[in-house]
Swiss-Prot record:
Coiled coil: none annotated. Pfam families: Molybdop_Fe4S4, Molybdopterin, Molydop_binding. GO terms for biological process: cellular respiration; Mo-molybdopterin cofactor biosynthetic process; nitrate assimilation. Keywords: 4Fe-4S, Electron transport, Iron, Iron-sulfur, Metal-binding, Molybdenum, Nitrate assimilation, Oxidoreductase, Periplasm, Signal, Transport. Binds 1 [4Fe-4S] cluster. Binds 1 molybdenum-bis(molybdopterin guanine dinucleotide) (Mo-bis-MGD) cofactor per subunit. Component of the periplasmic nitrate reductase NapAB complex composed of NapA and NapB. The lineage of its organism: Bacteria, Pseudomonadati, Pseudomonadota, Gammaproteobacteria, Pasteurellales. One of its GO terms (cellular component) is nitrate reductase complex. This is Periplasmic nitrate reductase. InterPro entries: Asp_de-COase-like_dom_sf (IPR009010), CT_Nitrate-R-NapA-like (IPR041957), MoPterin_dinucl-bd_dom (IPR006657), Mopterin_OxRdtase (IPR006656), Mopterin_OxRdtase_4Fe-4S_dom (IPR006963), MopterinOxRdtase_cofactor_BS (IPR027467), Periplasm_NO3_reductase_lsu (IPR010051), Prok_molybdopt-oxidoreductase (IPR050123).
Length: 828
C-alpha cells in the first residue's frame, strides 16, 4: 500500500478519530476506514494564528480533524486545542431552539426560558428594537459581537446596523483585545495591521516578546520560533512579562518587570539608541515625521471618577502635536539605565542587552506582542513606542524585521478590523466620521445620501454603562460571552442586563453565563456547520465550506442577521426627510434594501459546488456568502486593501492582502514586495499622503489602580494553553477539561507564607469590586514575583472578572485586564 504524506496524515486522523471513540482499527484497515470519511479544508476555530485543518465528516457529523500539511501557516501541526476541534461541536447542552423568558404564555423578564419559534423570537426582538429606537434614537439598540464571527457575518451585521438601523452602536470584543494595536497602526502608518508576515520567523535573528506568552497562546508560531532558535546559535530570544511563564523556557534574556513599567523600558531603549548613535538617520529622514502625544489623559473610567476629574486632557486624549527629533531626544533623556532599572526592577545588564539587540544594525529583530501590551491603560502609547524603535532603526518592512501585533481570535483582523465592526469603522479602514468615507459606503451599498450617520455608538465598556444608566435598551450579543469576559461584571454589566426596562439577546451554540443572564437565547450554528471565512494575524484571508448541518433549529449568525432584517421597513427605521427625497425606498424591508440590492443577491445557486451544503443560500435563494464578500471586497480594491475573488479563496490555503493581479503581499510598504510602492521609492508608508510614518513621543504615566495597605497585591488575568477565553468550547471537550478542570490563583511562595497559605488551599480573592473563591498554586507553570498574583477567566464557576477594573485606554477604549489591586486570604 503506497500512501502520500497527505494520505498518510488523513489515515492518521481516521485512526485518531477511532481511538477517541474507543474503537480499535487494525493497521491494514486504516485506509479503508479513512475512505469512508469525507475530507475538506477549514480554519481552526481558536486563536488568531490561522492554522488550517483537514476536517473529516461521516454520517453528518465531524468525526476527525488533522493539521493541513499543505497549509503554510502550520504545516500539518495543531496545538492541543486544535487536535480536539471536532469535540467542541458536540457538547450535551448544545442549544437547538430559541429560548425566550416567558410567563403565562408571554415574554416576562423574570419568566423561565421557554422554547419558541424563530418567528416568535424575531417578532419579540423587533418589537423591542422599534420601541428602543422610538425612545432613545438609533443608539438605543446595540450589537456586541466578536472576532470569531466570519467575515460574511461581520459584514452583514455592520451593514444592518450602520445602514439599516442607522446606528453605529456596534462593537466587537476585539475592543477588549486588539483596539490599541489597531488604533496605533492607524495613527502611525495611516493603515491598520502588520506590515510583515509569519515568514519573518525563519529569517529573524532575534525575537522579542512584549507581554506575550506565545508558548501557550500561539503554540504553533512558537514551535516555528523554537525551531529557528535551536537550529541557529546566533538567534536570540528575549521575553518580557510581569511574571514567568512557559515562553521563558526558551529565553536568552528574561525580563520580569513591575506592572506598567514597560513604558519605561521602551523609552529607555529609545534613549539608548539615541545616546549610542544607533539611529538609522537616512531612513528616519526619508520615511518618518515626528509628533508628540497629549499627556495626562485619564483612564477611561466614568466621568465622575476622581481620576477622570483630575486628568487635564481627557477630551483631547488622542491629539498629536507636530514635533521633531530634538523634542523626542529631550523627552526620553530622563529614561536612563538607572531609572529603567529602578522603576522596572529588571537588572541593568539585561536591560542593556535588550537595547543592544535593537541597536545592532546587523541584527534582524521581530517584536511580538499580545494582551500584555494591548490590555493597558496606555496600550496605544506602548504600541507607538515599539513602532518608534523599529522606525528609528529602520528595522521594518523587510524579511526578518518588524513590529508584529499577534491577534487572539481567529478573525479579529478579518472580521472586526478589516470589515469594520467597531463603532467608528467601515470596511477597509474607512471611518464613519469622514464624510467622504460615508459617501463611498452609501454608493457601494446603493443607499440614499445621509443614511449612514457620523454619530458614534457606545464602545464595549460604554455599552454596559449605557444599559445600566438607561441610555440603551436593547443589546444583541453574538458569538461572545461578555457577562464572563468583560470587566467589572458585578457592578457594570449585570445590572444593565437585568434592568427590567432592557432586553438582552444572546446568540450562541451553548448556554453560557451570558445566555443565562439574557432574555432570549438564539441557537447558533458553529464552525463548519456554515460556510465561513476568517482573516488571521498576518493578513491572510482563508475560506471553508459548510461540511455538516447544525443540530435542531440552530442557525448561523449570518442567517439570523439577514432573516431578522425582514422584520423592519425603511419607514420604521429611516427619517421621513430621507425617504421623501428618495421615494423609491419607501415601504421596502431592510432585507430588500441591504441584501436584495442586485449585488448581494447577484450570484445564483448554480454557482455553488455540486453537492455543497449551504443552508443560508438555499434558504434565501442565492449564493449569500459570495454576494456579501464581493460587495465587501469592492471597498478595498485599488487602495492597498485588495482582496482576491471569492472563488480564488476556496481553491487556495489563504492569501495575504493586498492581493494584486493574483499575487499576495508578504511585506507591505517595501519596494519589490508591495505593488503599491513605486519603483525608486524604497519604502512608502502610503497610508498617509506624504508616505511617512509617525514617530510619537510619549512618557510614562502611572496605572489607574495600584496596591495599597488593604488591597496589597497586583492582579494579572490571562489564559492557559488548554482553554480558550471563557471556556465555552474547550470546557466541553472532556480531555481539555480533565487536563485543567478549574481556575487557579498563582502566588509566590513567600506571599503565601505571609498569609498562612499553602499550595492547594481554597482562597478568597477580593478587589474593590467583587470576590471569587479559587485554589492556590505556588508550584505550577506560572511563577509570579512577590506582590503579584495571576489568574485566568475561563472558569464560569469563578468569574474572575468580578475582580477586574473597567479602566480603559482613553484613546482606543481597550480594557486593562492586567492591572488592578486585590487581597487574598484563606477561604472559610
Amino acid at each position: 500500500m503506497n500512501l502520500s504524506r497527505r494520505d498518510f496524515m488523513k489515515a492518521n486522523a481516521a485512526m485518531a478519530a477511532a481511538t477517541a471513540a474507543g474503537l480499535s482499527i487494525p493497521v491494514k484497515n486504516v485506509e479503508a476506514a479513512e475512505s469512508e470519511i469525507k475530507w475538506d479544508k477549514a480554519v481552526c476555530r481558536f486563536c488568531g494564528t490561522g492554522c488550517a485543518v483537514l476536517v473529516g465528516t461521516k454520517d453528518g457529523r465531524v468525526v476527525a480533524s488533522q493539521g493541513d500539511p499543505d497549509a503554510e501557516v502550520n504545516r500539518g501541526l495543531n496545538c492541543i486545542k486544535g487536535y480536539f476541534l471536532p469535540k467542541i461541536m458536540y457538547g450535551k447542552d448544545r442549544l437547538t431552539q430559541p429560548m425566550l423568558r416567558m410567563k403565562d404564555g408571554k415574554y416576562d423578564k423574570n419568566g423561565d426560558f421557554t422554547p419558541v419559534s424563530w418567528d416568535v423570537a424575531f417578532k419579540t426582538m423587533a418589537e423591542k428594537f422599534k420601541a428602543a429606537v422610538k425612545e432613545l434614537g438609533p443608539n438605543g439598540v446595540g450589537m456586541f459581537s466578536s472576532g470569531q464571527t466570519t467575515i460574511f457575518e461581520g459584514y452583514a451585521k455592520s451593514k444592518l446596523w450602520k445602514a439599516g438601523f442607522r446606528s453605529n452602536n456596534i462593537d466587537p470584543n476585539a475592543r477588549h483585545c486588539m483596539a490599541s494595536a489597531a488604533v496605533a497602526f492607524m495613527r502611525t502608518f495611516g493603515m491598520d495591521e502588520p506590515m510583515g508576515c509569519y515568514n519573518d520567523i525563519e529569517q529573524a535573528e532575534a525575537f522579542v516578546l512584549w507581554g506575550s506568552n506565545m508558548a501557550e497562546m500561539h503554540p504553533i508560531l512558537w514551535s516555528r520560533i523554537t525551531d529557528r532558535r535551536l537550529s541557529n546559535q546566533d538567534v536570540k530570544v528575549a521575553v518580557l512579562s510581569t511574571f514567568e511563564h512557559r515562553s521563558f523556557e526558551l529565553a536568552d534574556y528574561s525580563l520580569i518587570f513591575k506592572p506598567h513599567t514597560d513604558l519605561v523600558i521602551l523609552n529607555y531603549i529609545i534613549n539608548y539608541l539615541i545616546q549610542n548613535d544607533a539611529i538609522n538617520r537616512d531612513f528616519v529622514n526619508k520615511h518618518t515625521k515626528f509628533k508628540r502625544g497629549e499627556t495626562d489623559i485619564g483612564y477611561g473610567l466614568r466621568p465622575e471618577n476622581p481620576l477622570e476629574q483630575k486628568a487635564k486632557n481627557v477630551k483631547t486624549a488622542g491629539k498629536m502635536y507636530d514635533s521633531n527629533f530634538d523634542e523626542l531626544k529631550a523627552l526620553v533623556a530622563e529614561y536612563t539605565l538607572d531609572k529603567a532599572h529602578e522603576m522596572s526592577g529588571v537588572p541593568k545588564d539585561v536591560l542593556e542587552n535588550l537595547a543592544k539587540l535593537y541597536a545592532d544594525p546587523k541584527k534582524k529583530v521581530v517584536s511580538y506582542w499580545t494582551m500584555g501590551f494591548n490590555q493597558h491603560t496606555r496600550g496605544v502609547w506602548a504600541n507607538h513606542l515599539i513602532y518608534n524603535i523599529h522606525l528609528l532603526t529602520g528595522k521594518i518592512s523587510i524579511p526578518g524585521c518588524g513590529p508584529f501585533s499577534l491577534t487572539g481570535q481567529p478573525s479579529a483582523c478579518g472580521t472586526a478590523r478589516e470589515v469594520g465592526t467597531f463603532i467608528h469603522r467601515l470596511p477597509a479602514d474607512l471611518v464613519v466620521t469622514n464624510p467622504k468615507h460615508r459617501e463611498k459606503a452609501e454608493q457601494i451599498w446603493k443607499l440614499p445620501a445621509g443614511v449612514i450617520t457620523d454619530v458614534l455608538g457606545f464602545h464595549a465598556v460604554a455599552q454596559s454603562r449605557a444599559l445600566k444608566d438607561g441610555k440603551m435598551r436593547v443589546l444583541w450579543q453574538m458569538c461572545t460571552n461578555n457577562m464572563q469576559g468583560g470587566p467589572n461584571i458585578n457592578r457594570e454589566t449585570f445590572p444593565g442586563w437585568r434592568n427590567p426596562d432592557n432586553f438582552i439577546v444572546v446568540s450562541d451554540p451553548y448556554p453560557t453565563v451570558s445566555c443565562l443572564a439574557a432574555d432570549l437565547m438564539l441557537p447558533t450554528a458553529m464552525w463548519v456547520e456554515k460556510e465561513g471565512a476568517y482573516g488571521n494575524a498576518e493578513r491572510r484571508t482563508q475560506f471553508w465550506r459548510q461540511q455538516v448541518k447544525a443540530p435542531g433549529e440552530a442557525k448561523s449568525d449570518v442567517w439570523q442577521l439577514v432573516e431578522f432584517s425582514k422584520y423592519f421597513t425603511t419607514d420604521e427605521m429611516w427619517p421621513a426627510e430621507i425617504l421623501d427625497k428618495n421615494p423609491e425606498y419607501k415601504g421596502k424591508t431592510l432585507y430588500d434594501v441591504l441584501y436584495r440590492n442586485g449585488q448581494v443577491d447577484k450570484f445564483p445557486l448554480s454557482e455553488l459546488a455540486e453537492g455543497q451544503l449551504n443552508d443560508e443560500s438555499y434558504h434565501f435563494g442565492f449564493y449569500l456568502q459570495k454576494g456579501l464578500f464581493e460587495e465587501y471586497a469592492s471597498f478595498g480594491r485599488g487602495h492597498g486593501h485588495d482582496l482576491a475573488s471569492f472563488d480564488t479563496y476556496h481553491k487556495a490555503r489563504g492569501l495575504r492582502w493586498p492581493v494584486v493581479d493574483g499575487k499576495e503581499t508578504l511585506w507591505r510598504y517595501r519596494e519589490g514586495y508591495d505593488p503599491y510602492v513605486k519603483e525608486g521609492e524604497g519604502v512608502a508608508f502610503y497610508g498617509y499622503p506624504d508616505k511617512k510614518a509617525i514617530i510619537l513621543a510619549v512618557p510614562y504615566e502611572p496605572p489607574a489602580e495600584s496596591p495599597d495597605e488593604e488591597y496589597d497585591l497586583w492582579l494579572c488575568t490571562g489564559r492557559v494553553l488548554e482553554h480558550w477565553h471563557t471556556g465555552t468550547m474547550t470546557r466541553r471537550v472532556p480531555e481539555l477539561h480533565r487536563s485543567f478542570p478549574n481556575n487557579l490563583v498563582w502566588m509566590h511562595p513567600t506571599d503565601a507564607q505571609k498569609r498562612g497559605l499553602r499550595h492547594g488551599d481554597k482562597v478568597k480573592v477580593a478587589s474593590r469590586r467583587g470576590e471569587i473563591i479559587s485554589f492556590l498554586d505556588t508550584r505550577g507553570r506560572n511563577k509570579v514575583p512577590e506582590g503579584l498574583i495571576y489568574t485566568t477567566f475561563f472558569d464560569a464557576g469563578q468569574l474572575a472578572n468580578k475582580l477586574t477594573l473597567d479602566a480603559t485606554d482613553p484613546i482606543s477604549k481597550e480594557t486593562d485586564f492586567k492591572k488592578c489591586a486585590v487581597k487574598v486570604e484563606k477561604a472559610a
